[in-house]
Amino acid sequence: MVPRGFFITFEGGEGAGKSTQIHLLADRLRREGRDVLTTREPGGSPGAEAIRHVLLSGAAEPFGATLEAILFAAARSDHVEQVIRPAVESGAIVLCDRFLDSSRVYQGVTGGLASDFMAALERVTVNGLIPDLTVILDIDPEEGLRRASERRGKATADRFEKENLEIHRRRREAFLNIAAREPQRCVVIDASRSADAVSENVTEIVLRVIFDRAGLSEPTEAGSV
């Protein structure tokens, strides 16, 4: 029987550096000979990517927050069953840019949807697949939006980046509240530092999770597990 892999999600506000950190971590793990899959939400599977365009373009906004949350849930369900679950069951390390915590924050806290409704959607869409580790990259929203704008260049900002600063501040607080409620799953990392400094911190934490699963007290040599 193939040992179960790891499911690691990255969360945080706009411009926190999630995609950058996933790329750096994936490179490090692959150099150690590990099987790594990188993916994102909304998206990650053909069906979910089609829904992603509708969601990020703002085309779903006229239909209201409830239908929009259902679209996010549909994308996640397809992503989980077509991509994430098979990869984890095959022994891969899956690194995902956003997952259930983003729905809790964006559609729940700042979208105004009831927590019991969001919890019901979550149960159906993830079907028991909860991340082994969630890395929350924490950054001041003003700095995050500045970085996002710099990264984007002349491209059009997506609908979430266009929202007012107070909403971004509420989202930051909501992510930190999730981390406080679920310390066994979540770790908060200061993302205001350089990408290399953040990457070093992320790698140390992820390797600790891997070594703990293997029953070793401390990493002794890269790639030895």
From Swiss-Prot:
One of its GO terms (molecular function) is dTMP kinase activity. ATP binds at G12, G13, E14, G15, A16, G17, K18, S19. It comes from the Bacteria. It is an enzyme of class 2 (transferase). Keywords: ATP-binding, Kinase, Nucleotide biosynthesis, Nucleotide-binding, Transferase. InterPro entries: P-loop_NTPase, Thymidylate_kin-like_dom, Thymidylate_kin_CS, Thymidylate_kinase. PROSITE patterns: THYMIDYLATE_KINASE. One of its GO terms (cellular component) is cytosol. It catalyses: dTMP + ATP = dTDP + ADP. The keyword Membrane does not apply. Its EC number is 2.7.4.9. One of its GO terms (biological process) is dUDP biosynthetic process. CDD domains: TMPK. Phosphorylation of dTMP to form dTDP in both de novo and salvage pathways of dTTP synthesis. Belongs to the thymidylate kinase family. NCBIfam families: DTMP_kinase (TIGR00041). This is Thymidylate kinase. It comes from Chelativorans sp. (strain BNC1). The lineage of its organism: Bacteria, Pseudomonadati, Pseudomonadota, Alphaproteobacteria, Hyphomicrobiales.
